[in-house]
């Protein structure tokens, strides 16, 4: 995706799932698994997810499994890394879509029914360079499910938006 100039948009549940995905992304970056794009930016654009992440960071002894706790004992925070940017304000959120560099955007809601993810979908679904990566269950009747089921077009903010981005699901992370 990055090689073709695209971005990865991840609709994510704000509490728990976002932090789990940050953990995976930190490992990907640390291991250099995205060749030629080591310094890519990861945006977390959800006030609730940002606050939940702060709780995880501030209460590390209680929030992590043994593998993550071992990292903490080595002085490594398992969900904080270089290139991680949080967008708390509306202005910061809007600025993400003005950044034309390849990037990862984690935003709520996970099923795309509300929240800032809808703006990111509007700005990114039409572009075949991008990937929308679902990391959780998508209930019937939700926008997320429509995308996973192969919708050619969706309605966002009163406008029809063509679905040209690649739609993918990451198996094994849903709680369902």
PLM regions: where:
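Acidic/His-rich, metal-assisted hydrolase cores and their charged scaffolds
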Residues: 1-176
């Amino acid at each position: 995706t990055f090689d073709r100039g695209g971005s990865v948009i991840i609709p994510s549940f704000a509490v728990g799932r976002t932090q789990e995905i940050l953990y995976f992304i930190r490992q990907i970056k640390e291991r250099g698994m995205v060749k030629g794009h080591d310094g890519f930016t990861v945006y977390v654009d959800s006030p609730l997810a940002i606050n939940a992440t702060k709780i995880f960071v501030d209460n590390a002894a209680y929030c992590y499994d043994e593998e993550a706790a071992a990292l903490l004992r080595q002085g490594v925070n398992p969900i904080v890394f270089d290139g991680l940017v949080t967008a708390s304000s509306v202005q910061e959120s809007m600025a993400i879509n003005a950044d034309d560099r390849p990037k990862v955007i984690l935003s709520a809601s996970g099923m795309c029914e509300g929240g800032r993810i809808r703006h990111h979908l509007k700005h990114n679904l039409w572009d075949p360079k991008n990937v929308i990566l679902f990391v959780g269950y998508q209930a019937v009747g939700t926008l997320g499910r429509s995308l996973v089921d192969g919708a050619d077009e969706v309605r966002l903010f009163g406008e029809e938006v063509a679905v040209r981005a690649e739609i993918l699901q990451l198996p094994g992370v849903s709680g369902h």
